[in-house]
Swiss-Prot record:
GO molecular function, one term: DNA-directed DNA polymerase activity
Any one GO BP annotation for this protein: plasmid maintenance
Organism: Salmonella typhi
Family: Belongs to the initiator RepB protein family.
Annotated keywords: DNA replication, DNA-binding, Plasmid, Plasmid copy control
Annotated function: This protein is essential for plasmid replication; it is involved in copy control functions. In vitro, binds to the DNA repeat units, BCDD'D'', EFG and HIJ.
InterPro entries: Initiator_Rep_WH1, WH-like_DNA-bd_sf
Highest taxon, organism lineage: Bacteria
Protein's UniProt name: RepFIB replication protein A
Length: 325
């Protein structure tokens, strides 16, 4: 629904864009590859609290689940995200029978953004590991009281089967999660920016997060962007990665921004977003935001902010704490 006009807007995926559930884009399910040799060799397990976003699903509401967690192997941007895009496209563009969809393997590879010129062996080497990681990602819904616990455990994709000789791919989804694939708070994600950011996974990850935000988003804290990337390096190194990724997004023409400071917290003010990487005919529709002037902070408040920073507590953490009360 377009809030300004009241018009119902249908979002349809094609080769240049895909409909992505907002929850998966904001939560950091898909993150950059760990570049450090020490970290990259670890069988890294990712654990994400998805309670705030996914308790809105009808499954959670009907069963009274009040906690949702996504657990599984670390899903990267360069291969796993593109495979997930192919899965979303497959269910959107092909006939779903029961809980399964079937399509030619070569077409599925194209939907994943893999050139058809690649050999069958190279296709398998890219798609097979990604399908295993995505199918190995667990979503658990639970509710616990003083005496009992209820829990429903499922997967991002229930099963995947492919046969390159017969040229088929079969994908199976949990019917109770179809709503996740067609989330009512979804956005149309342009793939043009993703393609312009090849091998720049941090910039790709921040793009999917920023593009999921509503129009005229509030300033985004540096800490929130660090959390979205879910890196394991020291904080100062993570800050450099975030700033470099934001600059890369500006270089391809996706956005413009200003970095500001309020107290001891750094923020990014997004002036505009251009997923097509070109200016619209009417630039006034972008509603550029002017950076807010830095607020004066009293010495007492500055001491409190400094203490929170030493403890590793961010303003986002405090906001979540107050919301949970």
């Amino acid at each position: 629904m377009d809030k300004s006009s009241g018009e119902l807007v249908t979002l349809t995926p094609n080769n240049n864009n895909t409909v992505q559930p907002v929850a998966l884009m904001r939560l950091g399910v898909f993150v950059p590859t760990l570049k450090s040799l020490k970290n990259s060799k670890k069988n890294t397990l990712s654990r994400t609290d998805a309670t705030e976003e996914l308790t809105r699903l009808s499954l959670a509401r009907a069963e009274g689940f009040d906690k949702v967690e996504i657990t599984g192997p670390r899903l990267d941007m360069d291969n796993d995200f593109k495979t997930w895009v192919g899965i979303i496209h497959s269910f959107a563009r092909h006939n779903v029978i029961g809980d399964k969809v079937e399509l030619p393997f070569v077409e599925f590879a194209k939907l994943c953004g893999i050139p058809s010129s690649q050999s069958s062996r190279r296709l398998r080497e890219r798609i097979s590991p990604s399908l295993k990681r995505i199918a190995g990602t667990v979503i658990s819904f639970s509710r616990t009281d003083e005496k009992h616990t209820r829990e429903y455990i499922t997967h991002l994709v229930q099963s995947a089967y492919y046969d390159t000789e017969r040229d088929i791919v079969q994908l199976q989804a949990d019917p109770r999660l179809f709503e996740l694939y067609q989330f009512d708070r979804k956005v149309l994600l342009q793939l043009k920016a993703i393609n312009a950011l090849k091998r720049r996974e941090s910039a790709q990850a921040l793009y999917t997060f920023i593009e999921s935000l509503p129009r005229d988003p509030a300033p985004i804290s540096l800490a929130r962007l660090r959390a979205r990337l879910n890196l394991k390096s020291p904080v100062f190194s993570q800050n450099q990665t975030v700033r470099r990724a934001m600059e890369q997004l500006r270089e391809i023409g996706y956005l413009d921004y200003t970095e500001i400071q309020r107290g001891r917290t750094k923020f990014f003010c997004i002036h505009y977003r251009r997923p097509r990487l070109k200016a619209p005919n009417d630039e006034s529709k972008e509603n550029p935001l002017q950076p807010s002037p830095a607020e004066k902070v009293s010495p007492e408040m500055a001491e409190k902010l400094a203490l929170l920073e030493k403890l590793g507590i961010t303003l986002d953490d405090l906001e979540k704490l107050f919301k949970s009360r």
